[in-house]
Design a protein with these regions (language model features):
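Phosphate-binding and adjacent anionic-ligand microenvironments
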Residues: 236, 273-447
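Proline/glycine-rich low-complexity loops and linkers
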Residues: 126-161, 166, 252-325, 332
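Gly/Ser/Thr-enriched, mixed-charge loops and adjacent short helices
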Residues: 13, 108-232
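An N-terminal, well-structured beta->alpha segment
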Residues: 1-63, 67-68, 146-177, 384-389
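General beta-strand structural signal in soluble alpha/beta enzymes
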Residues: 5-6, 46, 72-76, 97-98, ...
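Short glycine-centered, acidic/aromatic-flanked micro-motifs in structured strand/loop junctions
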Residues: 47-49, 179-181, 251, 335, ...
């Protein structure tokens, strides 16, 4: 992966790591590269989530873009998938989303989209990185009338809302849904989408103040949603993350429906409707073992990729598949969107609920989740890429894998967005897999 851009763009602690200077440099380099690629003055749209550092980084990005002669179109607070959708609608050459997704408020990130709405290719990202890090002297600043313009797209959120609503072929009359907006981008759109389609909405965490994004709420903290669903007698609850590109659900009993179960529900429904392309659902190596058993039992192919929605999308495009996603709630429905879209996912869940007449708990029962233990081990920069070269660690993983046999599995991997090694173990006996996970984690900590 690149030196600035990880699996999900450039990310770090805002201002001190992801600095204003770096944001301006990314704006300049991206605008220059895109102007060269398109052979015309680049038009770049910019969205952001609701965190306090978004305004500052947006200003720096805009300054960078316009200082090399490109035009910047500001969308305001919108979901990440809105940028991917609007870049095509507005005939832009690229889109930028300023967000750190599910991370806490001190973090922020910069993610780039191409003019087709897909994440910018590795080749273009590498070219942008090289211009910033290796040959900054090649950046050509403009002056006078050659400086770029700044435009404000005041209808951006509504353009996205209308698009999502148009993908729904039924109404949600009679459905009570609780929506946890994570005090982020979903606060702008979710209620309008679901109430506009007829649902009765119970709103949670929909008042962002710049500092409360993802704070004990949203898809990483669903306890409040679980309680709200039960207390308010809802049919279902939906939890989004800070930029609303992922969605988790809660059934009417308050039980979690994670991304794996959402994929199972969707793939089963799509197969029954004859719209599951190539009879395949794309998942990752972190997908619950229960999904693979469900898929096999239902004649569905589970195509497997590395962790990261960009790899899921690559496999979908390569194989001509129309559904894929991750346990975290990144669900890509390629018939409608080029990226994970939490609010779109939520509308499709309610569509299945309405069209089948089943309760959310009944839909989720199509798949049995195996107990899964995840231990995150913090590592320093000098230890990155080292764990799998330590015989004591690899021997332990092999030994515990043999003990689990077909009734479990072990996956150890480095995070693409945080300084962590993740140790994940699945199996039927929670006590055993917890013990194994912590023993492996201890070995990694000692390396």
């Amino acid at each position: 992966m690149g030196r600035l851009f990880g699996t999900d763009g450039a990310r770090g602690v805002a201002i001190t790591e992801l600095t204003c200077e770096l944001a301006m440099q990314i704006g300049r380099a991206a605008a220059m590269v895109l102007t060269k690629e398109t052979n015309h003055k680049a038009k770049i749209i910019i969205g952001k989530d609701a965190r306090i550092s978004g305004d500052i980084l947006e200003s720096a990005l805009v300054a960078g873009i316009c200082s090399v002669g490109a035009d910047a179109h500001i969308l305001g607070v919108v979901p990440t998938p809105a940028v991917a959708m609007l870049v095509k609608k507005y005939n832009a050459d690229a889109g930028v989303m300023i967000s750190a997704s599910h991370n806490s408020v001190e973090f922020n990130g910069i993610k780039l989209f191409s003019g087709t709405g897909f994440k910018l290719s590795d080749e273009i990202e590498n070219e942008i990185e090289a211009l910033i890090l290796d040959t900054p002297e090649k950046i050509e600043l403009k002056d006078g009338c050659d400086i770029g313009h700044v435009y404000y797209e005041k209808d951006a959120a509504w353009d996205y809302i209308r698009y999502v609503m148009k993908t729904v072929q039924t109404d949600f009359n009679g459905i009570r849904v609780a929506l946890d907006c994570a005090n982020g981008s979903a606060s702008v759109c979710a209620q309008r989408i679901f109430e506009g389609l007829g649902a009765k909405c119970i709103m949670l965490n929909d008042k962002p103040d710049g500092t409360n994004i993802n704070k004990d709420c949203g898809s990483t903290h669903i306890e409040g949603l679980q309680k709200a669903v039960v207390d308010n007698h809802c049919d279902i609850g939906l939890a989004f993350d800070g930029d609303a590109d992922r969605c988790l659900a809660v059934d009417e009993k308050g039980e979690l429906i994670d991304g794996d179960k959402i994929l199972a529900i969707f793939s089963k429904y799509m197969k029954s409707m004859g719209i599951l392309k190539n009879n395949t659902c794309v998942v990752t190596v972190m997908t619950n073992l229960g999904f693979f058993k469900y898929a096999k039992a239902n004649g569905i192919v589970a195509a497997t990729t590395k962790v990261g929605d960009r790899y899921v999308l690559e496999e979908m495009l390569k194989g001509g598949y129309n559904i894929g996603g991750e346990q975290s709630g990144h669900i890509i429905l390629l018939d409608y969107a080029n990226t994970g879209d939490g609010e779109l996912t939520g509308t499709k869940l309610l569509t299945v609920l309405k069209c089948t007449g089943e309760k959310a708990s009944e839909l989720a029962a199509c798949m049995e989740c195996y107990p899964q233990v995840l231990v995150n081990v913090k590592i320093t920069a000098d230890k990155k890429g080292m764990w799998d070269k330590v015989p004591e660690i690899t021997d332990a993983i092999k030994m515990y894998s043999e003990k689990l046999g077909d009734e479990g599995r072990i996956l150890v991997r480095e995070s693409g967005t945080e300084p962590l090694v993740r140790v994940m173990i699945e199996g039927k006996r929670t006590g055993i897999i917890t013990e194994y996970a912590h023993k492996i984690a201890e070995l990694i900590e000692k390396m």
